[in-house]
């Protein structure tokens, strides 16, 4: 729930007259109801309408009194997203471009796997991290999303899957934006979708990825929720990583590894390192050896990513044969590594590409 204190702390949050009802955790809904002179058990009924029956309006909550429904309508909104574009790949990947209440646009992706359906969600409108290979940073950061706007992405995809009686089984927080720059809303989102009164998606089926905001890695290590953790690394040496990711100038590789060591000491959980391969930049065997040396001894997995071409960026994709060589070298050196399967290659699959095409919506 967005409080005055949260707004003061997070200047990039929106200032709507009504916040999304999906921004409330179950305990917050209970507390709010009590403050309004309502019975606490109504929270369970409201959450059932929102997350199990997945209604589109408060008026559909027919086991609530008229007065309570009006109270909810006076304080909250249910509809926060409008689908602007929906692109479907021949491999089943679906990319959504959603418009928010204030006209900004965000992307969400449904990816189909043998083991279930995964949704990649966005946490910010734009991004200020400035990774030089990413379309999401084009145009900078406009604002942070409310927790409810992140929840609504998952719910909208789930509603689309309801027609075929399928279920969202995994969530990855790897869409537009840096999740750790919208930390409190991200954590509320995680607690909401993980709650058994809500979507009840297991913590171990949710992954959050960061570019390396070190203070927040320490905070995340101290949380009481066992979410999977990934770090966008992309290079083992500061010179190369700073070229790809300017955030490295503030939080260098050495300090990043120290934070990850703390995370593992606290949680005893594996970390995934995401490593995008860029032709002639970080994809040689010497780079594989540098990477292996850096992360040796950590409980980790390396996810090698064949990069998507972004027209506004100059990087080129590494040849398939070189990707296999890179993976083989890591394995030879004792590092657990796999190559990420490419999905949605026939649509605007790179993070931020679809939104970049529609960005005139935001530059009114």
UniProtKB/Swiss-Prot annotation:
Alphabetized InterPro entries for the sequence: Aldolase_TIM (IPR013785), Methyltransferase_A (IPR040072), RlmN_N (IPR048641), RNA_MTrfase_RlmN (IPR027492), rRNA_lsu_MTrfase_RlmN/Cfr (IPR004383), rSAM (IPR007197)
Chief place of localization: cytoplasm
Cofactor(s) demanded: [4Fe-4S] cluster
Domain of life: Bacteria
Catalytic activity annotation: adenosine(2503) in 23S rRNA + 2 reduced [2Fe-2S]-[ferredoxin] + 2 S-adenosyl-L-methionine = 2-methyladenosine(2503) in 23S rRNA + 5'-deoxyadenosine + L-methionine + 2 oxidized [2Fe-2S]-[ferredoxin] + S-adenosyl-L-homocysteine; adenosine(37) in tRNA + 2 reduced [2Fe-2S]-[ferredoxin] + 2 S-adenosyl-L-methionine = 2-methyladenosine(37) in tRNA + 5'-deoxyadenosine + L-methionine + 2 oxidized [2Fe-2S]-[ferredoxin] + S-adenosyl-L-homocysteine
Alphabetized UniProt keyword annotations: 4Fe-4S, Antibiotic resistance, Cytoplasm, Disulfide bond, Iron, Iron-sulfur, Metal-binding, Methyltransferase, rRNA processing, S-adenosyl-L-methionine, Transferase, tRNA processing
Class in the EC hierarchy, top level: transferase
Pfam families: Radical_SAM (PF04055), RlmN_N (PF21016)
Active site: 107, 351
GO cellular component, one term: cytoplasm
Residue intervals of the Radical SAM core domain: 113-346
Tagged with keyword S-adenosyl-L-methionine: yes
SS bonds (residue pairs): 120-351
Keyword Transferase: yes
Residues given in the record as S-adenosyl-L-methionine binding sites: 177-178, 209, 232-234, 308
Stored NCBIfam families: rRNA_mod_RlmN
Biological function: Specifically methylates position 2 of adenine 2503 in 23S rRNA and position 2 of adenine 37 in tRNAs. Confers resistance to some classes of antibiotics.
Additional remark text: Reaction proceeds by a ping-pong mechanism involving intermediate methylation of a conserved cysteine residue.
Family to which the UniProt record says this protein belongs: Belongs to the radical SAM superfamily. RlmN family.
Record's protein name: Probable dual-specificity RNA methyltransferase RlmN
Organism of this sequence: Staphylococcus aureus (strain NCTC 8325 / PS 47)
Classification of source organism: Bacteria, Bacillati, Bacillota, Bacilli, Bacillales
Gene: rlmN
């Amino acid at each position: 729930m967005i409080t005055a204190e949260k707004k003061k702390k997070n200047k990039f949050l929106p200032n709507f007259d009504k916040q999304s009802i999906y921004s409330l955790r179950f305990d917050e809904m209970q507390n709010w109801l009590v403050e309004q002179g309502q019975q606490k058990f109504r929270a369970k009924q409201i959450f059932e309408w929102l997350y199990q029956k997945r209604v589109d309006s408060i008026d559909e909550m027919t086991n609530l009194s008229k007065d309570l429904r009006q109270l909810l309508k006076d304080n909250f909104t249910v509809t926060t997203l409008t689908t602007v574009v929906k692109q479907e790949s021949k491999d089943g990947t679906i990319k959504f471009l959603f418009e928010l209440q204030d006209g900004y646009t965000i992307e969400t992706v449904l990816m189909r796997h043998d083991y279930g359906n995964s949704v990649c969600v966005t946490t910010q409108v734009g991004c200020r991290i400035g990774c030089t290979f990413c379309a999401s940073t084009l145009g900078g950061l406009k604002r942070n999303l409310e927790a409810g706007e992140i929840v609504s992405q998952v719910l909208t995809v789930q509603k689309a899957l309801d027609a075929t009686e399928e279920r969202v089984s995994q969530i990855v927080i790897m869409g537009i934006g840096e999740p750790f720059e919208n930390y409190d809303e991200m954590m509320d989102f995680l607690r909401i979708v993980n709650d058994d009164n809500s979507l009840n998606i297991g913590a171990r089926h949710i992954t959050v990825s960061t570019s390396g905001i070190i203070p927040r890695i320490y905070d995340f290590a101290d949380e009481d929720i066992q979410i999977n953790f990934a770090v966008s690394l992309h290079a083992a040496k500061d010179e190369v990583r700073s070229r790809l990711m300017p955030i490295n100038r503030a939080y260098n590789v050495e300090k990043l590894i120290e934070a990850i060591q703390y995370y593992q000491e606290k949680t005893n959980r594996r970390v995934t390192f995401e490593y995008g391969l860029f032709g002639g930049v970080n994809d040689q065997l010497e780079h594989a050896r540098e990477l292996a040396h850096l992360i040796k001894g950590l409980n980790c997995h390396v996810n090698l990513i064949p990069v998507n071409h972004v027209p506004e960026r100059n990087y080129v994709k590494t040849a398939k044969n070189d990707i296999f060589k890179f993976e083989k070298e890591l394995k030879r050196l004792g590092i657990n590594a796999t190559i990420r399967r490419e999905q949605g290659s026939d649509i605007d699959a790179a993070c931020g590409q679809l939104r970049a095409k529609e960005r005139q919506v935001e530059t009114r």
